[in-house]
């Protein structure tokens, strides 16, 4: 039996034990792990520092280094996420609906775990804790395959989770990390349908494409984040500017940050000078369509070397960095058509006072989350009140949008009777 098969077999055994684990034990374990994350903050940062130094030496981009870094506040956020997950109602065992058959038997639809989750993700070590916490609360076993860039951070976090969790009553091997960084193991993992029930990839287009094309296990696709803001003709500019700034610059390496702004032509000359100045001050590289570029090219801005003409490749690109494209459109219909063609069905926002345009945008943009006068940065399990998320699904089957506890469950029918047979 191979290394991956051994992990799979252990996970399957653990998943059966998790079926009978009571809510009190799960919550006790999650709270104890949260406390230990705070207690071991320095040790976590020491392991993370090794990954950061290795990343810098190998030439990782600013965006990837940002995703990799664990600061005090991010560790505290991981602990808080576990506390929130512990506070949620346990979804397992919930009766969604029920009725009595005319022959006297009862039929109930009950929420149950998925079983064994295979989680494949890149760079962000906080995903290790979020994924483990959500899996445990939903009574799923999980096999984690993080990025080689974060291997030291992930190993430390996984050992901490298991040491404290098992002491609090979690079944052994409920959470396992693939500690070997050989990429060939991913191919083996995604074909381990004997033991793994579902795969959830979080990462770039290349990773997801490889998994979707090669997996023999059902995949819940968490999409790339080519997110947009459309500034309509009636937009409140004073409101729109800080929303765009937040959506682009607060944490550009995340999938819910925007990559492209669409501006209504009739408002372009009014908003572009101020928008351009603001984002150049923030050191964002701006890639404007030719028409937009002409409006501001003769204006005196600081950091003007970062104002550039866009190419066709910029529209639809996921930068995950301090880079943003911008183009002009004639109306809300054109904005919707553009977003549906160039976006990734993740999160998109409209800035407008026009109720009809707002409703049209919210109804017709084919994305997991659509916003009116709000930053796309709120597409997040924590912000939606889920405690954390195991990913943001951009597909339509099983789950869509931030995936919390309920999205890690399925259902079964429980029928009770006293000797009924079908005639």
Which residues make up each language-model segment?
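N-terminal Rossmann-like NAD(P)+-binding subdomain of aldehyde/semialdehyde dehydrogenases
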Residues: 1-107
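C-terminal core of ALDH-fold dehydrogenases
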Residues: 28, 332, 337-422
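Short, well-ordered beta-strand elements within core beta-sheets of diverse protein domains
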Residues: 14-20, 262-263, 321-330, 345-350
């Amino acid at each position: 039996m191979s290394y991956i098969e051994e992990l799979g077999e252990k996970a399957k055994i653990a998943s059966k034990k998790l079926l009978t684990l009571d809510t009190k034990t799960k919550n006790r374990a999650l709270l104890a792990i949260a406390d230990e994350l705070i207690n071991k903050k320095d040790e976590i940062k020491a392991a993370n520092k090794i990954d950061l130094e290795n990343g810098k030496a190998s030439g990782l981009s600013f965006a990837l280094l940002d995703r990799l870094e664990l600061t005090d506040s991010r560790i505290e956020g991981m602990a808080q996420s576990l506390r929130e997950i512990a506070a949620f109602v346990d979804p397992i065992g919930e009766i969604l609906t029920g009725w009595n058959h005319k022959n006297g038997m009862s039929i109930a639809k009950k929420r149950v775990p998925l079983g064994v989750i295979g989680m494949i993700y890149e760079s962000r070590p906080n995903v290790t804790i979020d994924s483990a916490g959500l899996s445990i609360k939903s009574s799923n076993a999980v096999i984690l395959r993080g990025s080689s860039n974060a291997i030291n951070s992930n190993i430390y976090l996984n050992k901490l989770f298991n040491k404290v969790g098992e002491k609090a009553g979690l079944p052994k091997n409920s959470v396992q990390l693939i500690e070997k960084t050989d990429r060939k193991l991913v191919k083996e993992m995604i074909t381990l349908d004997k033991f793994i029930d579902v795969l959830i990839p979080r990462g770039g287009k290349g990773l997801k494409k490889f998994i979707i094309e090669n997996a023999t296990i059902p995949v819940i696709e968490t999409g790339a984040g080519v997110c947009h803001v459309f500034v309509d003709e009636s937009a409140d500019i004073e409101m729109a500017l800080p929303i765009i700034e937040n959506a682009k610059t607060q944490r550009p390496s995340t999938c819910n940050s925007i990559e492209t702004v669409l501006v209504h032509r009739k408002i372009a000359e009014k908003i572009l000078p101020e928008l351009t100045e603001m984002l150049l001050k923030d050191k964002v590289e701006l890639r404007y369509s030719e028409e937009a570029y002409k409006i501001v090219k003769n204006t005196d801005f600081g950091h003007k070397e970062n104002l550039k003409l866009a190419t066709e490749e910029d529209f639809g690109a996921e930068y995950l960095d301090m880079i943003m494209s911008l183009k002009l459109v004639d109306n809300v219909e054109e904005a919707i058509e553009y977003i549906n063609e160039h976006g990734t069905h993740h999160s998109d926002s409209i800035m407008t006072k026009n109720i009809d345009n707002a409703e049209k945008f919210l109804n017709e943009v084919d994305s997991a989350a659509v916003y009116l006068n709000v930053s796309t940065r709120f597409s997040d399990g924590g912000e939606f009140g889920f405690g954390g998320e195991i990913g943001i699904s951009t597909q339509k089957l099983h789950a869509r949008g931030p995936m919390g506890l309920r999205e890690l469950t399925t259902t079964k029918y429980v029928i009770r009777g006293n000797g009924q047979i079908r005639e």
